[in-house]
Each structure stands twice: as C-alpha cells, then as structure tokens.
Swiss-Prot record:
Statement: the UniProt record of this protein carries the keyword Transport: yes
Coiled-coil segments: 234-255
Domain spans labelled UEV: 18-162
Disulphide bridges, residue numbers: none
Subunit architecture: Component of the endosomal sorting required for transport complex I (ESCRT-I), composed of ELC, VPS28 and VPS37. Interacts with FREE1. Interacts with TOL9/TOM1D.
Domain SB, residue spans: 292-360
Protein name per Swiss-Prot or TrEMBL: Protein ELC-like
One matching Pfam family: UEV
GO BP field: protein modification process; protein transport
Species of origin: Arabidopsis thaliana (Mouse-ear cress)
C-alpha cells in the first residue's frame, strides 16, 4: 500500500531540501547522481511504507564521520506463514549509486542477532550477492529490499528473548524463537550492550586485518631490500679482495721489473765502452758462431733460401709494376728456383744427418 499523499509530499520536500543544500552542510554526493538518488528513495518508500528517509552521521572504519542519507525502518519477512518485520538501516554511502549501499540489521533492545548467520555479521552488517554484484545504473533500492526480504525469510537474522509466559504474537522476529530451545533471558540493556560491543570488535578486527596486511607488504619490501643489500655487500667484498690480490701481484711484478731494470742498466754501463771498440772491427757474419760444420752449413743454406725467396718476391712485384720484362722475369725465376731447390735439398740432408747423430747420441747415453 502506498503512503498517504501528505506523507509523500513531506518526503518529497525533505529529499529536495537535503539534496539541494550547499556549503559545509551539503551531502557528499555527486551532483549528477542526486536526482537518481532522490528517485531511488521515493520508489523505495512507495514500495515499502515502513521505511523513512533520514539524514544521520555515519562513521567509517577509519574513524571518519560524515552525514549521509539513510532509509530507516523495517523490511517484511514472511516466515512459516506469518509476516514479521525486521528493523534495518540502509545507508547511502558517498559513492552511491555507482557502488552499493551499506545495510545493517538494527535489532531493538529485546532482540538478538542470530549467530552464526549466513548473511548477517555479529555487528549487524548485511552481506548479500545482490550487494556484491551491484551494477550501476540498473541496481536499485527496491530490488535490494526485495532480496533482503527473501534472504531473511530463508534464514531469519533475529530472535526475540523469551519472557515467561510466552506471548505468541507477530511481533518483530518473535516467530523465529519458537524452534529454538529454551534459554535464559538476558537483560535487554545487556543485550544491546553486547551487540554494540560486537560491532566495535568487528570494526577493530577489520582495522587490524588491514594494518596487518600493510605491515606484511612493508615487511616483504624490507626483506627484499635487505637481501639486495647483502648481495651487493658480497659483490663489493669480493671485488675488494680481487683488487687487493691484483695490487699485490702488480707490486711483485713492479719489483721484478725494477730489478731487471737495474741489472740491464748495470750491464749497459759496464759494456758501453766495449761496444764502441767492437763496432770498429765488427763483422756481421762472425756475430753468430755455429757449434759444428753441419750447423754452419744449415745456417748458410737457410739464409740463402730465404734470400732467394726475398729476391723472387721483389721480382714478382717489379713484374706486376711493369718495370721487369716478362722473358727476363721467367729466366731469372727459373735460375733462382733451381738454386733455391739445391739449397733446400742440401738443408734437408743436413737436417737428416743431424737427426741421426742426435738419435745416436741419445742411444749412447741410454746404454752408458
């Protein structure tokens, strides 16, 4: 049943006034969404007359307080053929309607939240698939209230405390207490206090979980940094050790070079005068003396072979440059090649004789 026209007029005026306020008292909703928020609340009140729009202070888990719109009242809950009313508060958060509202079951002083419950936490916070799968702009408060009623019908979230004698009446949540075993009646103020404490404990627990997650991330970052620093420390230490070893090696090599320099300098000073006397009568051919005639013949053949090789190379270059006629080039190459062959053959025979003599000498030493 729709609310009376007078009440709807009051609700229209209230929402228009609340959503058009400016300055510090303005509600924290985006300007382009205020008309949709107003329409959602009007549709909700028209479908569920037991709900009323209000403004109240909402405290976030981080301690921030902000004035928000809410729908406060009851949601019908059909259960075992009887309709009961479940008190709820639907908070329209700052991000509404892009994001879902926050719904709390708000038990009266003679009610207790069922624990455990599939959709309601001990603090009264409601969790539904419809809220988790909220889709803007198709999701709305009327459908949310319908899903709340259906979920509560499957599993009533509240039960009333028993007071002898039992009074069966369709009061809020009274029908749900019948299938439960008799239990001791708690003081209503104590129950309200317990529910408030449970809500605070849940908020603190949520803050602790967030802080713990942040600390874990920070700790992982510090451990990773510590590992990198240790690795760099090892690399620096290894590099320093290598530099020390290299320095010691260079110092040793420097000492050897200094000693060799001193020896070479002493030898030069001692033989500098002798070299001047030797240069007067020095014969290049007598600079190297062979130990025997075979070695001398080998040296001569090798020298002549290499000399002929140089001559042929020079002739080849002259022929390519055009300074040597072709017939003369062929004739000289033929003569030099024949002579070079003779010297190479002689050197090969001398090498064989030397090898035989060396083998005989080694055999004689082995038998002696």
């Amino acid at each position: 049943m729709a609310p009376p026209p007078a009440k709807m007029q009051e609700i229209h005026q209230f929402l228009s006034s609340a959503l058009t306020q400016r300055g510090p008292s303005a509600l924290p909703y985006a300007e382009n969404t205020k008309s949709l928020i107003r329409q959602h609340l009007l549709n909700l009140i028209s479908s569920y007359t037991s709900l009323d729009p209000k403004t109240a202070t909402f405290t976030h888990n981080d301690g921030r307080s902000v004035i928000l719109l809410q729908a406060d009242g009851t949601i019908p809950m059909p259960f075992q053929g009887v309709s009961y009313n479940i008190p709820v508060v639907i908070w329209l958060l700052e991000s509404y309607p892009q994001y879902p509202p926050c719904v709390y079951v708000n038990p009266t002083r003679d009610m207790i939240i069922k624990r455990p419950h599939s959709n309601v936490s001990p603090s009264g916070l409601v969790s539904l698939p419809y809220l988790q799968n909220w889709i803007y702009p198709s999701s709305n408060l009327v459908d949310l209230a319908s899903h709340l009623s259906a979920a509560f019908s499957r599993d009533p979230p509240l039960y009333s405390q028993r007071r002898p004698p039992p009074q069966p009446s369709p009061s809020i949540g009274s029908g749900y207490s019948r299938p439960l075993p008799p239990r001791q009646t708690d003081d209503a103020a104590e129950v309200y206090k317990k529910n408030a404490i449970n809500r605070i404990v849940e908020m603190v627990h949520g803050d602790i979980v967030l802080m713990r997650s942040a600390r874990e991330v920070e700790t992982e970052g510090l451990l990773s940094l510590q590992s990198d620093l240790k690795r760099r420390e090892e690399e620096i230490n290894n590099g320093f050790k290598e530099m020390v070893i290299e320095k010691e090696t260079l110092e040793q090599q420097l000492q050897v070079i200094a000693m060799n320099t001193d020896v070479l300098g002493s030898w030069i000073r001692e033989n500098q005068g002798k070299a001047k006397d030797l240069l007067v009568d020095l014969d290049v051919d007598d600079s190297f003396e062979c130990i025997d005639s075979l070695s001398k013949q080998m040296l001569e053949c090798t020298a002549l072979d290499l000399a002929i090789e140089d001559v042929v190379y020079s002739m080849d270059k002259s022929f390519r440059d055009g300074s040597l006629p072709f017939d003369q080039y062929l004739r000289n190459v033929r003569l030099l090649s024949r002579e070079q062959f003779f010297h190479r053959a002689t050197a090969e025979k001398v090498r064989e004789i030397q090898m035989d003599a060396q083998v005989a000498s080694i055999a004689a030493r082995l038998h002696s």
